Structure formats: structure tokens, C-alpha cells
Amino acid sequence: MTSNTNNGNRRNFLKMAGTGAISAAALAAFPPSIRRALAIPANNATGTMRDIEHVVILMQENRSFDNYFGTLQGVRGFGDRFPIPLAGGLNVWQQTYVPSSGPSRVVLPYYLDSSAGNAQRVSGTPHSYPDAQNAWDLGRMSKWPTYKQTQSMGYYKQAELDFQFALANAFTLCDAYHCGFHGGTNTNRLFHWTGTNDPTGAAGGPVIDNSGDHLDAGVTYNWTTYPERLQTAGVSWKVYQNMPDNFTDNPLAGFKAYRDANAARGNAKDGSPFPAYTPADETISPLIKGVGNTMPDGGFLQALKDDIAAGQLPQVSWIVAPATYSEHPGPSSPVQGAWYTQEVLNALT
């Protein structure tokens, strides 16, 4: 994370919050869910990772860092003093757009102003392996609007992302994290859930597209996933999702081990009729909680809230949002994703 005065102020803020020295006015600037999170004393009995009791992971969809946080003070965004140089004396912010017909033109980053239109609903961009590789252009970084369309140069400010900016200012934001793979959704989610896309093809890969992102897909993967490793190590885990609508964002559905668990539960190949998960299902297969209908309320987190209230939150949890709250351009929006993230934080605090 970039180090500067703003980051120093954030660290000082968190230190003051931990000692109770922060003013009520400063805390009041944050949403209630963030205020409650900041008010919880840190469990730092040993000062090591052993103090971590629960890890809850929510991965949202298809937003670049600069699309959200390019204007946030203190990060390497649009204020970067050393932008990547391009051919012809341009830099990476000056992208040449070559349309299918008509003259080419330079496209600069532009503000998606919600006061001037429905910027929350800007359409999505292509996000598959071929267009990602072409936009990257062997590292030249010069063809983003040509292959990702001109809206790939659009960005939001705090006015559109009030909750996301509050999260970034209250906690840690990393400005140099990148996709595991120049490609689409499922491949990167495979890195998230398994650490690889099987590049050598030893176990069903290499995965470069979304063809295996549902239970009844024609392709099958056979390498070991993180949940399986946790299971072997005796670490409790669970995937919280609504199986009829997880926006096909759970890549575990592509693995034979999880499909076998689905079949043992008596479900059809596609998971239907999507029976509500119960702990008794684990006697059939512990992996069913990776592809079962663990949030039958439509994905609105009631099962997560119930587990927390009962003291049964697993040591490691993944949450997969339904399409409307996935933050993916098109079916979702920044404000809908913010609401969902806030609900997760509300449940945890």
C-alpha cells in the first residue's frame, strides 16, 4: 500500500480508535456498521496470527481499482507521478481508441457523474480471455478502450461510493493488488478458492474461461481446493450462497469432488431442487456446504446471521452475493454492492 500522509493519518486514526482517544465527531462521520466495527477491541493476546478466530471473505465483481478508488487521496491512482509511458509520447491515461469504423481518438479517464445521469448503471465491459490479452497488449497497456470499450476509462468519486470510501478510510486498502490472470471471472475466482487455474493441464485445466462455473457444466476439475485443505486440517469452513442465484460466482461447482457431494445429496446435476442446507447434510459429504443452498432466503445473509447468533460461525467463511448485489456492472451497481457489504458488516458486528 502506498505510504503517504493520508495513510499516516489513517493509522493514527485507528490507533486513537483503539485507545478511545478519538472524538465522537470523527466517529460519527462513518456509517453505523463501520463505527461498531471500529469500537470492537482487537484480539491481540499473542500479537500473532493465532489471535485470528474467524476469516470472512466477500469477493465482489468486475470493478477495477481506478474505477472505484482512482481519486482516493493517498493511493497510486490518477495522481500517479510516474504513469506508464506509451508509444507516441502518450502515457497510460491517454488511451487510443480504434473503433470498428471511423477515425481513432484518444480517450482520457472521465468521471461517471451520478448527478448528470444514471452513472450507477453504466454498462459492463468485455471481460474474457481474448479481450483481456488484447487490451494488455503484451504489457504495452495501450489498447484498453479498443478491446474493453470506452467505458473502461470511466471512474467514480466519493459521491457515488460513499460506503466504499468510508471502508477504505477506516480500514486497509491495497493499491497494488492485481488479478491472478488476465482473463474473466471464473479463472480469477479459481485462484481465489484454489490458488491456481491448473496451467499445466494436469487436472482439467488450464482454465481460461467461464465454461466450468456451474454444477452441470461439461468440463470437470480435479485439483484440490482450499476448502478441502481446510477440511483435512480440521479447520471449519462454509460457503454462504443462494444456489438458485449465486451469479455463477462459486467456482467450486466445477470440481468433481463437489459435484459428487451434490449427487450424494440427491440433487439433480444442476443442484435442483436446491434444498435448503442443514448441518445434517454433512453426514452425506462435508463438501456439500461448498455447493449447497446455504442461504435459501435469496442470499440475504440470514443463515450467516443465524450462525453468528448461535456461536457457530465457521473459522473460514466465503460469501457469494446474488447477481443484484454482486456489484457487477449491468445487473448490479456500486450502491447495491455497498448495501450488501454493509449488511455483512452489520451481521459481524
Regions found by a protein language model. Give the residues of each.
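N-terminal pro-sequences and low-complexity stem/linker regions of secreted or lumenal proteins
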Residues: 2-349
